[in-house]
Amino acid sequence: TEIAEIQKRAVQLTIFFAILAIGLMALSPELVWILGGTQYESGKYVAIPLILSAFAVFIYNVVVPVEYFHEKTMYIMIGTAAAGVVDIVLNYIFIMRYGFIAAAYTTLVAYICYAVLHFFIARKLSGISILPFKVVCFIVVLLLCMAALNLVFISSVIIRYFACAVVVIPMGLLLLKRLFKEKNQNG
């Protein structure tokens, strides 16, 4: 069915974006150093939560078209405003105490709220999930574990790259296998 095809593509895109996010998290300290030099070295602690924020925005962009389709754009405005309020309140509480690094984490929390809210709104409106809940949960837990590992071992290139390879290679092979299988079935 058309819905099943959309769900399949959404899962494939989510896996692809997760692979990118995991790779970027592993590379982020070196990327910060290459792009900013030693004077921006503390930025390596901001990169990982910002990469996770980008993933949350990706999830939002996968599910929000359902709200447009059902012409319920008021929900988009409400969700955006709610996430903005969460971000402002958290920034007010944490930035003065913990500095600019806190801003990355408050942004992450706000974007997670944004994505979760719209995920459930879209599911309520359509009666189905564009992205299966179990898939999203698995990938989010995987990303959070990889983020924690990358932060704990931020000074160890070998551990970060090895962990990235252990996760990304099987995910990439699985995705490619599914894409080739699909291509062969469709001629």
Regions found by a protein language model. Give the residues of each.
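Membrane-helix interface segments
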Residues: 42-43, 72-75, 100, 128-132, ...
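Hydrophobic, membrane-facing alpha-helical anchors
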Residues: 51-61, 109-121
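Membrane-embedded alpha-helical segments of multi-pass transporters/permeases
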Residues: 21-26, 34, 46-49, 88, ...
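Membrane-interface helix-loop junctions in multi-pass transport and translocation proteins
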Residues: 74, 80-116, 151-166
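Alpha-helical transmembrane segments
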Residues: 63-71, 119-133
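Specific pore-lining/lateral-gate transmembrane helices of multi-pass inner-membrane transport
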Residues: 1-80
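Hydrophobic alpha-helical interface/terminus motif in multipass membrane transporters
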Residues: 31-35, 67, 94, 109, ...
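Transmembrane alpha-helical segments of multi-pass transport proteins
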Residues: 83-86, 132-183
